[in-house]
């Protein structure tokens, strides 16, 4: 049903909405079928929120709505969890719900309750996750605290989800509460190895490293010590090790592990499609910051220079050629 064909005028729709006080405490049981969504009123609102051609109509309706009307609209949108999910999991539904967030504390209270009821499902959805992200920016401190607690509880689930990891990264970046920000960072740090080996979780570790928090970087390096070489053989793990090499304190931890392994393993790493980038970066940054470690790597790699040629390690062989006469 196109918005232009909607038989419900703005005043008719809002007049038909229930009083907010009648629905604010309603929490449907798990798996509850959204029977209300079959009513003409719910169908009209669903169409308003999700129709790709209804952008201007939605903007007009919101601009002309007063606080009470917006509150009633929020009440109807969140009166049933399944109905709410059916809206926020669509591209336009998510965007329009985000537009409603921050209008007033009363409106936000309805959306906060709805997000908390289906927190994990919402925050791991491709589109709905942006509702949580937006909520963490515009909600008041009390509502943010409730969401922070839920985020901490589900943080690892979010980190290991393809959409949840993006949401978690944004939430960490925008976190304006020092206590909860530190709690989230500590959770990532303490689970660095597990997350580094996860297809989605490694992006969270990478993100925390790009915040350049010296304490976090050091602690991640310490927690990954002994596993850096193994991670370097993997596509995403190698990205994490490369980032650790960019800061001197964590770089030392990685290079000490490289120097401590047997030469054959270091050679295999240097020939690896992902590991060669780690070795090149180790040579580059040790040369800039720690010449003693740089020469240690050169001497350890030099006996294998002939094996590095015509492989992924050819770029390393070229670097070694420059210093061959000095060894």
UniProtKB/Swiss-Prot annotation:
Example GO BP: regulation of translation
Pumilio repeat copies, ranges: 79-114, 115-149, 150-185, 186-222, 223-260, 261-295
Domain (PUM-HD): residue spans on this chain: 1-324
SMART domains, per the entry: Pumilio (SM00025)
GO molecular function annotation: RNA binding
Keywords: Cytoplasm, Repeat, RNA-binding, Translation regulation
Gene Ontology, cellular component aspect: cytoplasm
Location of the protein in the cell: Cytoplasm
InterPro entries in UniProt: ARM-like, ARM-type_fold, PUM-HD, Pumilio_RNA-bd_rpt
Predominant cellular place of this UniProt entry's protein: cytoplasm
Pfam families according to UniProt: PUF
Domain notes: The pumilio repeats mediate the association with RNA by packing together to form a right-handed superhelix that approximates a half donut. The number as well as the specific sequence of the repeats determine the specificity for target mRNAs.
Function: Sequence-specific RNA-binding protein that regulates translation and mRNA stability by binding the 3'-UTR of target mRNAs.
The protein, known as: Putative pumilio homolog 19
Annotated source species: Arabidopsis thaliana (Mouse-ear cress)
Name of the gene: APUM19
């Amino acid at each position: 049903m196109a918005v232009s064909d909607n038989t419900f005028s703005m005043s008719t729709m809002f007049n038909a909405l229930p009083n907010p006080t009648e629905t604010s405490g309603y929490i449907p049981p798990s798996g509850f079928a959204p029977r209300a969504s079959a009513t003409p009123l719910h169908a009209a609102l669903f169409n308003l929120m999700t129709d790709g051609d209804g952008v201007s109509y939605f903007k007009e309706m919101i601009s002309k709505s007063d606080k009470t009307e917006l509150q009633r609209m929020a009440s109807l949108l969140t009166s049933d969890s399944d109905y709410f999910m059916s809206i926020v999991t669509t591209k336009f539904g998510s965007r329009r719900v985000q537009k409603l967030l921050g209008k007033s504390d009363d409106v936000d209270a309805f959306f906060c309750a709805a997000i908390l009821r289906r927190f994990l499902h919402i925050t791991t959805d491709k589109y709905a996750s942006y509702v949580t992200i937006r909520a963490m920016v515009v909600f008041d401190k009390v509502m943010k605290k409730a969401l922070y607690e839920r985020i901490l509880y589900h943080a690892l689930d979010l980190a290991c989800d393809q959409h949840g990891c993006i949401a978690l990264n944004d939430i960490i970046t925008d976190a304006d509460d020092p206590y909860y920000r530190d709690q989230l960072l500590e959770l990532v740090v303490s689970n660095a190895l597990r997350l580094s080996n996860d297809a989605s979780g490694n992006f969270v570790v990478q993100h925390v490293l790009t915040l350049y928090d010296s304490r976090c970087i050091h602690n991640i390096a310490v927690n990954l010590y002994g596993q850096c070489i193994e991670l370097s053989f993997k596509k995403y793990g190698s990205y994490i090790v490369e980032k650790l090499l960019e800061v001197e304190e964590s770089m030392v931890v990685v290079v000490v592990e490289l120097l401590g392994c047997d030469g054959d393993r270091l050679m295999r790493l240097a020939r690896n499609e992902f590991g060669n980038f780690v070795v090149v970066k180790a040579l580059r940054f040790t040369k800039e910051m720690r010449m003693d470690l740089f020469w240690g790597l050169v001497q350890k790699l030099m006996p294998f220079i002939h094996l590095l040629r015509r492989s992924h390690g050819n770029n390393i062989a070229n670097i070694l050629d420059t210093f061959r006469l000095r060894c």
